[in-house]
Structures are given as structure tokens and as C-alpha cells.
């Protein structure tokens, strides 16, 4: 998986929430795919998915938490756990895929909690079952947690300014 934002993510420091999520997904192994996109892009990208995939959907909103020395990003995330299925799927087979994606979600949440990148996800995390929502035949679950960074942008240093060339 390539770096998505080299301006803010470096070898020594992951400066974006997306890079932290990507790193967590990478820790789950090569048998899990990863996509970072909006739902329209995911609809196209899923045409080529052949293995269970975690989709970090471009967050629609969030909040900043300002402290005396740093700012923490708290995006309202949508994270989908999907796997390909047949067009005319059997209910029992599809239920097995849903259950497998729930287990992948549990692995992901455990990895988030062990990563130290975000506050622990605990208590109730509602999910929605996903099938027949996209053009490609995938089944899975979607969660919508608020990811709270443990380390954010340092306010003691001058924030980098992006300028046009």
C-alpha cells in the first residue's frame, strides 16, 4: 500500500488519520485489502476486489480538539469490511460472509486499540449490513466510529504551509 499523503506522512511520523488507519490495516496481513475513497470511488474500485477488503470512507465530518500544545483530529469515520459474493447468493452462504466480515471488524478494532494511534474503541459500536448497495456484488458490515487521535499536530512548531509552486 502506497503512501497517500507524502506532504504530511513521513517515515518517522504518520501525520494523517488515513495513514494511521492504513498502517493498522497493513498490520492485519496481506490477505486483507485496503481502499481509501468515497462511496462513488469504492463502487468502481470494488469491481476488482478478490479478497476481504477494508474501506476507509473519506470522512464527511469531524471535529478538532485543541489542547495547549497540539490539535487532535476526530473524524466521524465510516469503515466498511466487505468481501465479494455471487450475484444470486444463497442466504446461508451470504450470512457466512457477513459473519466473517464481523470477525474482520473485530480484528480491526482490536488492532486500533493496540496501535496507540487512537483512543480505544469500546462500548457499543453499531454496524449496518451491506449488500446490494453497490454495483459490484459485495457483502459486509459498516461501522461509524469517531476516531480520536492520541497524538496530533504540534502547536509549538510552526505548522507547515502548503504553497503553490
Question: PLM features: residue spans?
Answer:
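A short, hydrophobic beta-strand-centered structural micro-motif
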Residues: 49-61
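Short N-terminal edge-element motif at the start of the domain
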Residues: 43-46
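Charged, amphipathic alpha-helical segments and their flanking helix caps
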Residues: 1-39, 60-165
Amino acid at each position: 500500500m502506497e503512501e497517500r499523503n507524502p506532504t504530511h506522512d513521513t517515515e518517522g511520523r504518520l501525520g494523517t488519520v488515513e495513514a494511521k488507519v492504513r498502517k493498522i490495516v497493513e498490520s492485519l496481513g496481506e490477505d486483507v485489502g485496503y481502499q481509501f475513497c468515497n462511496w462513488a470511488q469504492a463502487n468502481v474500485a470494488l469491481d476488482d476486489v478478490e479478497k476481504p477488503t477494508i474501506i476507509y470512507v473519506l470522512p464527511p465530518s469531524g471535529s478538532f480538539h485543541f489542547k495547549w500544545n497540539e490539535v487532535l483530529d476526530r473524524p466521524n469515520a465510516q469503515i466498511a469490511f466487505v468481501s465479494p459474493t455471487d450475484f444470486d447468493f444463497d442466504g446461508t452462504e451470504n450470512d457466512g460472509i457477513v459473519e466473517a466480515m464481523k470477525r474482520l471488524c473485530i480484528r480491526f478494532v482490536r488492532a486500533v486499540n493496540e496501535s496507540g494511534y487512537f483512543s480505544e474503541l469500546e462500548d457499543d459500536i453499531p454496524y449496518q449490513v451491506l449488500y446490494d448497495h453497490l454495483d459490484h456484488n459485495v457483502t459486509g458490515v459498516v461501522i461509524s466510529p469517531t476516531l480520536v487521535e492520541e497524538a496530533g499536530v504540534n502547536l509549538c512548531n510552526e505548522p507547515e504551509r502548503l504553497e503553490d509552486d
